[in-house]
Regions:
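Patatin-like phospholipase
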Residues: 1-44, 52-240
Length: 240
């Protein structure tokens, strides 16, 4: 599959809320002629699900129909099994995900070119203390958000880079502002080696109000609301 070097995407974490918000934004952009399918995408945690779904043309409705594992859940492979229900054993070279390798806690990028996306999203979303690490090729990985919520600095080069940061902006007061500052710093690092511009999305106040507490990030009904909010934000956003 050929990628589109003029456009790329990087999507951050945020639980079920983050998946809904990111896929809403992605769908809203697609309606406006900015289609990320077939473009290089980098996802962290929830963002890895958004990237995989976009690459494989899996709808948010299909993802929302998955049963959410109970937390904490020490069983190995439980999240990968859920992901395989919608992604099967498909691979896709346009998808890369950020994971944290244990025990060294090293931020690592894995490619979907030769590893099933179901395994990649499970590794990138294995929240320590809630889910068991995901093993890939003999190595153990946990949630990529342990080291960075978005990892813009690790994104591929593109003329325009779509950044979706579900936990930045108005989310959780000071925490959202911290994520935003971290993401801004990563953008500066990315710009040192790439000349592209950014199209940035972070939840507005109304969207952030859907998830006022951390546990709300894993509520399916709130995630559906976030999807429609992301859709509206992308439709209304001024894009040059």
């Amino acid at each position: 599959m050929e990628t589109n070097p003029t456009l790329g995407g990087v999507f951050g974490g945020g639980g079920l809320f983050g998946i809904g918000y990111a896929l809403g934004v992605i769908e809203g952009l697609r309606e406006r002629g900015i289609d990320l399918h077939g473009c290089p995408m980098l996802g962290t945690s929830a963002g890895s699900w958004a990237a995989a779904a976009t690459a494989l043309k899996v709808s948010y409705k299909d993802l929302a129909g998955l049963e959410v594992p109970t937390f904490p859940n020490p069983r190995a492979g439980v999240l990968a099994a859920s992901a395989r229900e919608v992604f099967g054993n498909a691979t896709d070279p346009t998808v890369r995900v950020v994971v944290t390798e244990v025990p060294r806690l090293r931020r690592t990028v894995l490619s979907g070119a030769d590893t099933p996306l179901a395994d990649l999203v499970a590794a990138s979303s294995a929240v320590p203390g809630l889910l068991a690490p995901q093993r890939i090729n003999g190595r153990r990985y946990v949630d990529g958000g342990v080291r960075s919520g978005v990892s813009v600095d690790l994104a591929d080069g593109a003329e325009r880079l779509v950044i979706i940061a579900p936990l930045a902006g108005a989310m959780f007061g000071p925490f959202g502002r911290f994520v935003e500052r971290r993401t801004d710093a990563e953008q500066r690092i990315w710009s040192e080696t790439h000349s592209g511009t950014f199209i940035e999305f972070a939840p507005r106040a109304v969207t952030a109000g859907i998830a006022s507490r951390p546990q709300h990030l894993f509520d399916k009904a709130r995630a559906l609301e976030a999807y429609f909010c992301g859709l509206d934000e992308a439709r209304q956003r001024t894009i040059e």
